From Swiss-Prot:
Organism of origin: Pseudomonas savastanoi pv. phaseolicola (strain 1448A / Race 6) (Pseudomonas syringae pv. phaseolicola (strain 1448A / Race 6))
UniProt-listed Pfam families: Helicase_C, RapA_C, SNF2-rel_dom, Tudor_1_RapA, Tudor_RapA
Description of how the protein assembles with itself and partners: Interacts with the RNAP. Has a higher affinity for the core RNAP than for the holoenzyme. Its ATPase activity is stimulated by binding to RNAP.
SUPFAM superfamilies per UniProt: P-loop containing nucleoside triphosphate hydrolases
Top class in the EC scheme: hydrolase
Gene giving rise to this polypeptide: rapA
Protein name, entry field: RNA polymerase-associated protein RapA
Segments carrying motif DEAH box: 278-281
Amino acid sequence: MAQQYQPGQRWISDSEAELGLGTVLAQDGRLLTVLYPATGETRQYALRNAPLTRVRFSPGDVITHFENWKMTVREVDDVDGLLVYHGLNAQNEVVTLPETQLSNFIQFRLATDRLFAGQIDQLSWFSLRYNTLEHTSRQLQSSLWGLGGVRAQPIAHQLHIAREVADRIAPRVLLADEVGLGKTIEAGLVIHRQLLSGRASRVLILVPENLQHQWLVEMRRRFNLQVALFDAERFMESDAGNPFEDTQLALVALEWLVEDEKAQDALFAAGWDLMVVDEAHHLVWHEDKASREYSLVEQLAEVIAGVLLLTATPEQLGQDSHFARLRLLDPNRFHDLKAFRAESENYRPVAQAVQELLDKGKLSAEAQETIHGFLGAEGDSLLAAVNTGDDEAKARLIRELLDRHGTGRVLFRNTRAAVQGFPERKLHQYPLPCPVEYLELPVGEHADLYPEVSFQSQPEVSEEERWWRFDPRVDWLIDTLKMLKRVKVLVICAHAETAMDLEDALRVRSGIPATVFHEGMNILERDRAAAYFADEEFGAQVLICSEIGSEGRNFQFSHHLVLFDLPSHPDLLEQRIGRLDRIGQKHTIELHVPFLETSPQARLFQWYHEALNAFLNTCPTGNALQHQFGPRLLPLLESGDDDEWQSLIDEARTERERLESELHTGRDRLLELNSGGAGEGEALVEAILEQDDQFSLPIYMETLFDAFGIDSEDHSENALILKPSEKMLDASFPLGDDEGVTITYDRNQALSREDMQFITWEHPMVQGGMDLVRSGSMGNTAVALIKNKALKPGTVLLELIYVSEVVAPRSLQLGRYLPPAALRCLLDANGNDLSSRVSFNTLNDQLESVPRASANKFIQAQRDQLTPRINAGEEKITPRHAERVAEAQRRLAADTEEELARLTALQAVNPTVRDSELVALRSQREQGLAMLEKAALRLEAIRVLVAG
């Protein structure tokens, strides 16, 4: 018979007990809407199978009104489907309490109900529940939460930025690292940590259309974030009233969005906590006019609290364009371009003084005068201490200057010069004769840069005449691969057709094991290709990628890169080299560039090498130089006088050297120091690597797999294959694939094998499995025989596991101060608590299972004796709970007071501190303290131990 639901009825979620007491809001057709006031969250369920249990108290139960007074139930009436409780309050007065007025924080003693109902679980499940609670508590308190689970090597500056930004309330910042330093990973870490902490629950990611796939791959593969990619087709085909409301994470191409007003309306109506905009430097703004893209992002930034802009470095952009990004973040602060220019000039001497302090360890009289002018009299004592060689004072002085830096809190910009760990590059050039078949082709756009595409598109080309049978680059590639033997080689070319043809050529002409990677393949096909390439023993020697197909992938286990052709823009060239040239690459990057002599390919090679120096170094000036010289460059690539060509090369080289000199002298060491974290990032790296070396996760997961009926078998070194067994307990276990998955706990293995799941405490499989344990009832009762000579046979010990927790909105992050913790009580026959003398594991080693029928018979016989002892357990544990709550309140108050004091003082000298930040922080403190006041104890599990 179907459940009858009425608005106002109280129900509890079977799968999300932590939400507290729910209230039925509405029954609409086949949907049921339930509000959970304790957390402020709403859930919708299918009416026929809602995972809900009716809250119905019985005479003798003590219940709580939402105003915190208690009553003992004597009678229960059902009035039109709503329960009304009658009973006595603490003053012995007759009172009535309708269920609509029940406290949202009431806890349920389900363990007791199951124990006396004969639902007794295995000892292994009891241990799993206890260990799950312990690990949950530990992770929620960890400073690494949201930072350690990414499929990437931990890198100091990225971790520093992620923690600094993600721990703010509604962060509004500009990430402007140089190319290759991992802005996308920084943004992903911020998104991930904000989602896990509850500071954000809905995220909008706006990117150029050509980067959509890269973001999709990065978010899914690195962070296990299920991002929904939106385009015109998906938007039109959606049955939902507002397609954007159906997803937590939306990835949208700006080019499509700016053209579709209906999609814009839906996007604004959906509501978002955080907006991330990639390639924000392409948003065009001038004082008198802004582009449609800029205006759209500006309107969104006005209604979305958190904004992350990913952009080129300020030096590349120029000051006006840099100002345009900053005004998106804070239009009140950055409203006047002239004032911004003047302010920037004022900071330059301070940055130079800091550079002097860092380089020389002391300050000249001129530098001291500059700092005095900036900090005033309060900086004099610090300066005096610095002059005596006090390193701590030096660090404090730099910190003070950082805090007051004009854009120090909103701008993060790391440079390769400031970040160590990049490999060298070595260039190998191979001029080859241009075949007559290409010389006879008609001249067309890009025809001479990619002649194989033009040749193959001719209708009369037969199988025997295919381009790879005569192109000398193919012969050269085969010879090079044979010379390198089984060394892994990445080949990148502009077009998918070229990549597929090259795979055919290698198979037909050489038998060299190769695989291909292009935009026509789905993610699973690309994963398989990447895994085949990564396999050291039986894998492909060469992976052939198209330009677009390789976006978002990391192949740094290889260090040989073949540029089979050259892209038409220096940014694309840097993207190609960046597939291997990343922090953590352990070898020199060997760049192999074949090109056809006396062709546009040869001149483009010369342009990149001699004018831009783009092969041997990153080229931060490449975009500006291409824009400046592009109108002259393109005609000269195809034809033109040699002297005119050489003149262009010389001019561009001179201009590049001038721009690079400007960049170097304009380096803001103060900003670099702030962005790098001044040592904080290194500490995070060490902590993550230390966590990686621990065995607690694999040990815990093995017990979890056993409990849920997941079979695991060795795949290879450091890798396991997981498959559902015939005895799989719960089909909702988040295995990821019904057929099975391959996992690894090893970070390095996961980096080279993207087809394997990288299992960390943050992985959805781990979190989902732990949620199933916590939200279910399995393991909250057990009966065991204890073998201990010190105990008289027949002695009954009672082990009670309580959860000390606070039910509150995740955005308050009270889990940092009062994470759900298992408080254990071990009562002997006299009511003494032995838990401090006998640990959980020590006790576990002395226990033997009891058949369920025998256990149930014993419990029923002992029910009258056990009930008062169970009730007495809460009295034993309450002081420990109260101590935890008081400490949590103290820490929360201290942390917020310290941060409020810092920000208030800072606001007086640095206008980038927003009033809204201070208001939100005060509100968060008051709400947090009020919620902690309501923290409760919940009896989570009972184990009855009989000495034998």
